[in-house]
């Protein structure tokens, strides 16, 4: 039995096809989110990889920022529930999830069974999000994917004290004019993000294991800065961007099983 989970975010679209609720047979990430061709391109890639068609997929669950704009799904489920389900499937001992997305940052607290107990979110300001990193990368003229490796060479991290993106831009430009090293500026940017997000973690309560997901989790500099700020090791799964889509695919499997039961009872 095949089920599918789609996670349509603000800046990326992700998809997972699951077999029998256990095996990931295909996954895909496209750097285009809601309101773009991203979701349809994810489907095209997934079907191309597997040779499957829509009629072969028993159930589809969609999650993410753009879930309500996607009509060809059997159910919409919040990204909070889907990330909790997906992460718990990969790392059952997880108690805290840090999810830094393109437009917001979320911290989730799970119980011993992987169920969502509580969450906090920062969605009022770009600082502390992937968007903030995109803006900063453009200012210092590097690709955002290179920030993590660049920051690892820092020996004299500069301070980025502003919590507002506009003022932080001015600080970075000032550091550049003072000939600060790029790696030291990037390290300061990472610490700025980590401080903002770690305040959410501390408010909700740090419980190990702590797992970080989302595209920003691929940035080793951010992960290191976050671990330092909360004084706890952070685990990054092999598929940090896909945990929401995976959780959605698992919920889709639940839906498919329930449908089978209903058919048998007729």
UniProtKB/Swiss-Prot annotation:
Enzyme Commission no: 3.-.-.-
InterPro entries per record: ATPase_BadF, ATPase_NBD, CoA_E_activase_dom, Dehydratase_Activator_Redct
Cysteine pairings via disulfide bonds: none
SUPFAM superfamilies membership: Actin-like ATPase domain
Keyword Mitochondrion (UniProt): no
Stored Pfam families: BcrAD_BadFG (PF01869)
Domain of life: Bacteria
Positions contributing to [4Fe-4S] cluster binding: 125, 164
Broad class of enzyme this protein falls into: hydrolase
UniProt keyword list: 4Fe-4S, ATP-binding, Hydrolase, Iron, Iron-sulfur, Metal-binding, Nucleotide-binding, Plasmid
Gene Ontology BP annotations: L-leucine metabolic process
Family: Belongs to the HadI activator family.
Subunit structure: Homodimer.
Additional remark text: Only in the reduced state, HadI exhibits significant ATPase activity, which appears to be essential for unidirectional electron transfer.
Protein name per the record: 2-hydroxyisocaproyl-CoA dehydratase activator
The species this protein was found in: Clostridioides difficile
Source organism phylogeny: Bacteria, Bacillati, Bacillota, Clostridia, Peptostreptococcales
Gene: hadI
């Amino acid at each position: 039995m095949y089920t599918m989970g789609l996670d349509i975010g603000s800046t990326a679209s992700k998809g997972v096809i699951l077999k029998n609720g256990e095996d990931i047979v295909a996954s895909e990430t496209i750097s285009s989110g809601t309101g773009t061709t991203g979701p349809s391109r994810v489907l095209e890639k997934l079907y191309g990889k597997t040779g499957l068609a829509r009629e072969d997929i028993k159930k589809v669950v969609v999650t993410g920022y753009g879930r309500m704009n996607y009509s060809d799904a059997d159910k919409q489920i919040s990204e909070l529930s889907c990330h909790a389900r997906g992460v718990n499937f990969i790392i059952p001992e997880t108690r805290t999830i840090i999810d830094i997305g393109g437009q917001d940052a979320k911290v989730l607290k799970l119980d011993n069974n992987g169920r969502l107990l509580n969450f906090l979110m920062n969605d009022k300001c770009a600082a502390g999000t992937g968007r903030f990193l995109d803006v900063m990368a453009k200012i210092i003229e590097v690709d955002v994917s290179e920030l993590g490796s660049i920051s690892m060479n820092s020996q004299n991290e500069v301070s980025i004290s502003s919590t507002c993106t506009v003022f932080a831009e001015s600080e970075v430009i000032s550091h550049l004019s003072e000939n600060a090293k790029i790696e030291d500026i990037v390290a300061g940017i990472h610490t700025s993000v980590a401080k903002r997000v770690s305040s959410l973690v501390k408010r909700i309560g740090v419980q190990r294991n702590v797992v970080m997901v989302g595209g920003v989790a691929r940035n080793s500099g951010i992960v290191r800065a976050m671990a330092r700020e909360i004084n706890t090791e952070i685990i990054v799964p092999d598929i940090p961007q896909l945990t929401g889509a995976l959780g959605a695919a698992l919920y889709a499997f639940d839906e498919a099983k329930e449908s089978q039961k209903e058919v048998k009872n007729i």
